[in-house]
Curated annotation (Swiss-Prot):
One of its GO terms (molecular function) is DNA binding. The gene is dctR. The lineage of its organism: Bacteria, Bacillati, Bacillota, Bacilli, Bacillales. Phosphorylated by DctS. Pfam families: HTH_64 (PF20714), Response_reg (PF00072). It comes from Priestia megaterium (Bacillus megaterium). The modification 4-aspartylphosphate is found at D58. Member of the two-component regulatory system DctS/DctR. Essential for expression of DctP. This is Probable C4-dicarboxylate response regulator DctR. The keyword Cytoplasm applies. Keywords: Activator, Cytoplasm, DNA-binding, Phosphoprotein, Transcription, Transcription regulation, Two-component regulatory system. It comes from the Bacteria. Its main location: cytoplasm.
Length: 228
């Protein structure tokens, strides 16, 4: 049976942001905010009380931050899915949030379209898996790659989400600035392709660019993920 409504719990300390997020969520068909908490401690209690399908958590909060809250949710065995909505963009926080099973990570500031995208992808995946007791590898691949394709609609023409994610992952593993040639070799793509993705990420303010001037030849651009 398809679930026609998903319950959502908001954990956000800023009342104005909390209200904006509530309005965003309830504009998307099939989602209802059933409760809201202003900190992680209160949020965990509300999860226990309401058992929401989806919990949307900010990372920076008083009393108990979002990452600690997410860890506690998993330690207690609560089955709510989690979307992180936060200004935190440092790689270590992103990695930990994903390791604890967040289904999406939305960076502030964001527009309604990004929240809508996250919720629609979540809804689509939940509807599809609710229709089956068992699933094949090809069916699972189709569901997961559909999410990449939907994200690709937001990218400039010629770029795709799968390659972008591979490049972001490769960059996150580096501890020093690297060139487009090194990215191309590491990811297994053409140098000109790597350069296009790196330029896009720089425009999105995700990369720090440094220029290396050698004795001969043209300067070399080197890139590193920003850690705020």
């Amino acid at each position: 049976m398809n679930k026609k409504a998903w319950t959502v719990l908001l954990i956000e300390d800023d009342p104005m942001v909390q209200e904006v997020n509530r309005q965003f969520i309830e504009q998307v068909e099939g989602f209802t905010v059933i409760a809201a908490a202003s900190n992680g401690l209160e949020g965990v209690q509300l999860i226990k009380q309401h058992q929401p399908d989806l919990t949307i958590i900010d990372m920076y909060m008083p009393s108990q931050d979002g990452l600690t809250t997410l860890q506690q949710i998993r330690a207690n065995g609560y089955k709510t899915d989690v979307i992180a909505v936060t200004a935190a963009s440092d790689i270590e926080t992103v990695r930990k949030v994903l390791q604890y099973g967040a289904v999406d990570y939305i960076m502030k500031p964001f527009k309604f379209e990004r929240m809508k995208q996250a919720l629609e992808q979540y809804r689509s995946f939940q509807v599809k898996i609710s229709q089956k007791e068992h699933i094949t590898q090809s069916e699972l691949d189709s569901m997961l790659f559909q999410q990449f394709e939907e994200k690709a609609d937001l990218l400039p023409k010629g770029l795709n989400a799968v390659t972008l994610r591979r490049i972001q992952q490769y960059l996150s593993e580096q501890n020093h600035p690297i060139s487009a040639e090194e990215v191309a070799d590491g990811v297994g793509i053409a140098r000109v392709t790597a350069r296009r993705y790196l330029e896009f990420l720089e425009q999105e303010n995700e990369l720090k660019l440094s220029v290396e001037y050698g004795r001969v030849g043209r300067p070399i651009n080197r890139y590193m993920l920003k850690i705020n």
